[in-house]
Amino acid sequence: MKHSNKPYDSFQDELEDYIKVQKARGLEPKTCFRRMRGEYLESCGYREEFDSRPRYRMFDQRIPSGTNHSYPRSCSSSQTEDRVPQWLPAHDKIRLNSLNYCQFTRDGFSEKPVSLNLSQQEYNCGSYSVESVVHKDLCSGHSTIDPQVSHRQMYQKRKRHLEEGRERQEERPKHERKRSSEEMDLNKHKSIQRKKTKAETETVQDGTEKLKNRKEKKNRDVSSKKEDRKRRKEKKEQGEERTEEEMLWDQSILGF
């Protein structure tokens, strides 16, 4: 019994026709190849990776060799995984596996035989589409940076740092000169203040010494006057206190 090559309006019609052919041959094909992606993620609890390739092998083993056709395949899951970067997160790998499986099922049930060159072209296009999807997913969350722009920014930043360092080195002597002039002015002011305070203290000391000398001189004059007065008084008292012999002598000789 030959397989019909009539075109199908949908995948469901093609699948029903395939089931009828297999039942006519006495085989019981599996109709549930894969659940929907959302149901799979919900049931499996967001598993990181899964391997659906044994199902493909079981399905290929159930089909007789007479009905096998050279169907175009975009790329296998192992090839797609080899082309995927290792730094992709787990959910991106799951997404790529699901895209690969859908592409495989569509190509597997198409009834049109394709030449080798066309299958190779579709393989290249499929791999390019997968890579473009990965690139879009990555670019949606991360902004791409042009390496030339980054090198230019680094060069400008380094140049700016060098210019700032030169400006600091040029400004340092200015600050040092300004600081030295300020220190000189401060030292000069301090020396003037010291001289002024020294002169004031000297004048105060001179004044106190003069006052002290004047006071001492005055005290000496007063004491000398007192001593002279005391001597005069003593002489006078001595003159008044004559003895009887002196008085008789005076009377006899002088006639007093």
Swiss-Prot record:
Keywords: Coiled coil
Annotated Basic and acidic residues bias: 161-188, 218-227
Name listed for the protein in its UniProt record: Lysine-rich coiled-coil protein 1
Biased composition (Polar residues): 64-79, 141-153
Region (Disordered): 61-83, 141-256
Coiled coil region boundaries: 208-247
Species this protein is from: Rattus norvegicus (Rat)
